[in-house]
Structure formats: structure tokens, C-alpha cells
């Protein structure tokens, strides 16, 4: 069901994770955020090929985790979430996805991309 929203709770509130397509992707993929550079928010899209436990985290340039956007099991599909950096300073940030197929103890897919916050 397109545009089905799933909410993930964290310390900064509820973050919507939208299923933008239920078409099952052939592979896992972390897309480039848009816009980039951004202020104060940017869209992050990713594809999940199999039912998986997904973590999507944001790190600063020193490698410190500044936000966890997703930490839950997701069904196959194409997803989008919004990263709001309203309370963060300008600079380079990295977003990392870590996917573990449901029932597996080993990682299935991991990728990291760079984004720039300009205030």
C-alpha cells in the first residue's frame, strides 16, 4: 500500500517511515539524500529486498551518533524518512543503514553516505 506510514519513537519524538512502494526491490539500497546540502531537513530513501531488521542512524563528522531514525523490522519495499536537523550545527554528517534479514544473526547489507547541513 503506497504511502503507508510507520512511526518510530526516539528521544526527539516520532519519526515517520513511509512505505512509498510495495514493489519488492531486487536488492538492498541506500539512496542519496535530497536535498543535499540541506537546511533543516532532508529525505532519505532506502530499499529493503527481504523482511529485515533495519537500523538507520546519523553520525557527526567525529563518528558520534547524533540520532537514530529507524530501529525496527520492516517488510520488503521502498521506504522514505525525513531527517530533521533543526537542533544540530552546520557541518558534515553521515547516515548509515544496517540491515539484518529476519531470523539471521549476520548482517545482510550495510552502507554509509555523506550529507551536509548548512544553516
Protein language model regions, located:
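C-terminal tail/sorting-segment detector
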Residues: 90-119
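A glycine-anchored, Pro-Gly-centered beta-turn/N-cap motif
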Residues: 75-79, 89-92
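Glycine-centered coil/turn sites that cap beta-strands in beta-rich domains
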Residues: 17-59, 68, 80-85, 98-106
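Solvent-exposed serine/threonine-rich low-complexity stretches and specific carbohydrate-binding patches
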Residues: 66-74
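Short, compositionally biased serine/threonine- and acidic-rich segments at solvent-exposed termini, linkers
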Residues: 1-21
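Extracytoplasmic/periplasmic beta-strand context in beta-sandwich domains
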Residues: 4, 81, 113-114
Amino acid at each position: 500500500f503506497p504511502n503507508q506510514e510507520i512511526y518510530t519513537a526516539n528521544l526527539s519524538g516520532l519519526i515517520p517511515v513511509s512505505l512509498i512502494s510495495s514493489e519488492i526491490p531486487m536488492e538492498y539500497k541506500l539512496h542519496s539524500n535530497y536535498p543535499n546540502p540541506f537546511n533543516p531537513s532532508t529525505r532519505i530513501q532506502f530499499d529493503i529486498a527481504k523482511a529485515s531488521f533495519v537500523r538507520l542512524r546519523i553520525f557527526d563528522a567525529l563518528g558520534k551518533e547524533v540520532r537514530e531514525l529507524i530501529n525496527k523490522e520492516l517488510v520488503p519495499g521502498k521506504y522514505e524518512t525525513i531527517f530533521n536537523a533543526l537542533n544540530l550545527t552546520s557541518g558534515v554528517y553521515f547516515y548509515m543503514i544496517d540491515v539484518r534479514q529476519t531470523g539471521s544473526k549476520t548482517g545482510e547489507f550495510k552502507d554509509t553516505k555523506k550529507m551536509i547541513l548548512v544553516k
